[in-house]
Amino acid sequence: MIKIRRGLDLPITGEPRQSIEDGPSIRSVAVIGFDYHGMKPTMAVQEGDKVKKGQLLFTDKKTEGVRYTAPASGTVSAVNRGYQRVLQSVVIDVEGGEAETFAKYSESDLANLARQQVVDNLNDAGLWAAIRTRPFSKAPALDAVPAAIFVSAMDTNPLAADPTLIINERPQSFINGLVVLSKLTEGKLFVCHAEGASVPQSSVATYETFGGVHPAGNVGTHMHFLAPVSLERQSWSVGYQDVMAIGDLFTSGELASERVVALGGPQMENPRLVRTLVGASLEELTAGQLKAGENRMISGSVFGGRNAYGPTAFLGRYHNQVSVLAEGRERPFMHFVVPGSKRFSALPIYISTLMKGKKYDFTTSCNGSERAMVPTGSYEQVMPLDILATQLLRSLIVGDTEMAQKLGCLELDEEDLALCSFVCSGKYEYGPILRDNLTRIEKEG
């Protein structure tokens, strides 16, 4: 077992009850453009078109041939675009149950599939986009071959669901998905899980155990310790629920768009796990469930999720949780001189440090304005990777991409720097800064 000792488990209230319930009926779903880094769509539909589940919505001009499909049948009600016509979302009003059909195989035939059969079927159904590369966290080229593939069957994010609870609802789907994915690489297929977790076993996969504090469950952490990446050595990652969807696709011939999502946070009345659709409207999913006041809906983790509002108020493609926090617009007078029994800090500056096990009603407040980056050692306390955290973050801030590559930025995704953003006394958001640098590296080298 690989034990992660440097990191942080956030003591936040609103932890969801670990039992799965049916969610409310969803009337609209969406494919969010921002979920796919650098993607430039060629649209195949327009507002008013009727679509089936699994029908093509658009392809990517940059990664030629990669298809993005509808998660549900219905009518395209909106194609939302932002600045410079960047695609924000394609919204579908759900109606009917029509679905496209794809190649279908018996479970015994999955082990004999050719690689091209797997690639074609995944791409036809839109599940090729469920795979993400590292570096760059994008959908891979259709002819790319990874050094390794990672499936994370654990989640240490605050307020997350227990993946084994979800996987063991349909264990054979998970195993079938692993068999299919094993055809895409000549290297290892890693399944990473928590200590003592009951994960369905398959001979095609290598199982690794991780323990300790967050980010022990991040796929970037797993790659760093098991198969580090570089520009010449690419690895892929696939979410555990997408592995199950892949298994179902190949045995049923139909796109599976069900997703189990954790609803949690201090402002959630009834934190729990619900069964819903990929891309579900978060307003409909949380209707009647929010506490009074001004709230912020987050698709994903409180550390690395996306503010979901307006045309993007839908469940993200790679998200398994929805978090709700109160908007922290208040500015307490001289909060830095109070004992702080009701406040949390990663540094031992409040008396709450002595109150082990206490949980807090976090808000969106940053507790201060932006200022210069100060190296206090807090970054190193939450960075478990073998990386010089302060030096890397400085390189990213000034845009020194050559030094950032030497210091290991190619191994990272936004979620890997989320804890650095949380503990930063300068209030920097390192995720977007990292993405800007990765985009430059991809373009310029």
UniProtKB/Swiss-Prot annotation:
GO molecular function per UniProt: oxidoreductase activity, acting on NAD(P)H, quinone or similar compound as acceptor
Keyword entries, A-Z: Ion transport, NAD, Sodium, Sodium transport, Translocase, Transport, Ubiquinone
Keyword Membrane in record: no
Enzyme class: translocase
Reaction(s) catalysed (UniProt annotation): a ubiquinone + n Na(+)(in) + NADH + H(+) = a ubiquinol + n Na(+)(out) + NAD(+)
EC number: 7.2.1.1
GO biological process, one term: sodium ion transport
HAMAP family linked: NqrA (MF_00425)
Its job: NQR complex catalyzes the reduction of ubiquinone-1 to ubiquinol by two successive reactions, coupled with the transport of Na(+) ions from the cytoplasm to the periplasm. NqrA to NqrE are probably involved in the second step, the conversion of ubisemiquinone to ubiquinol.
Protein family: Belongs to the NqrA family.
Quaternary structure and interacting proteins, as annotated: Composed of six subunits; NqrA, NqrB, NqrC, NqrD, NqrE and NqrF.
Protein name per the record: Na(+)-translocating NADH-quinone reductase subunit A
